[in-house]
Amino acid sequence: MEKTEIVRKYVEKLINSPINLTAYKDFDEAMAFLYLDSVLPVKSEDLGEFFLDIGTGGGVPGVFLSVEFDKKGLLVDSICKKVHFIQQTCKELGIKKVETLCARAEELKGKGDFFEKFDSAVSRAVSKIATVLELTAPYVKVGGKLLLYKGPGYNEELGQSVNAMKELGVKLSEVRRYSIRGKDRFLLVFEKISHTPDKYPRRIGIPEKRPIR
């Protein structure tokens, strides 16, 4: 099956699933705001051999990144029926390089050798920047990238994340602005510049309730 056909079929299954996986029910809108929004800003990035997608939901952006760039990815979500959807749909469509795990990001420390294992991490519409950095940075190798998809209101969050960046060993290297159907979107590219203390991420719920300040 051609890559384009795989993507189109995956989008069709996303919007038609009885599980509430996306607010987009129109195929063309879903192709724009789910698929294109996932891959367009990342075309100039090297995800490395193995990337992590935290809070993947129905597999966005992880499935599309894996298919588009032929990369291996671990897609993590705490809602098991969403993870099951990804597993079944990838099997049906012959998507080979997607692995899945039903877990909270905070739980990865206890579920395998994931600390500083990944070449990159991605996250889309999960939480505020400081929280997402705590949930991703511990699992990315030094020299790796953290890619956060954000809307126009990211500036205030970024200002509140300065101490989190220092504590977690990451720095902001680029803010990439792009447009999907006339709507401004931003990809925040962080670089992992030093080892993250192994006390991170903190236990379940704490990164959200008490972000590093």
From Swiss-Prot:
GO terms for cellular component: cytosol. Coiled coil: none annotated. InterPro entries: rRNA_ssu_MeTfrase_G, SAM-dependent_MTases_sf. Signal peptide: none annotated. The keyword rRNA processing applies. GO terms for molecular function: rRNA (guanine-N7-)-methyltransferase activity. Its EC number is 2.1.1.-. Keywords: Cytoplasm, Methyltransferase, rRNA processing, S-adenosyl-L-methionine, Transferase. Its main location: cytoplasm. It is found in: Cytoplasm. S-adenosyl-L-methionine binds at residues 55, 105-106, 124. SUPFAM superfamilies: S-adenosyl-L-methionine-dependent methyltransferases (SSF53335). Specifically methylates the N7 position of a guanine in 16S rRNA. Belongs to the methyltransferase superfamily. RNA methyltransferase RsmG family. This is Ribosomal RNA small subunit methyltransferase G.
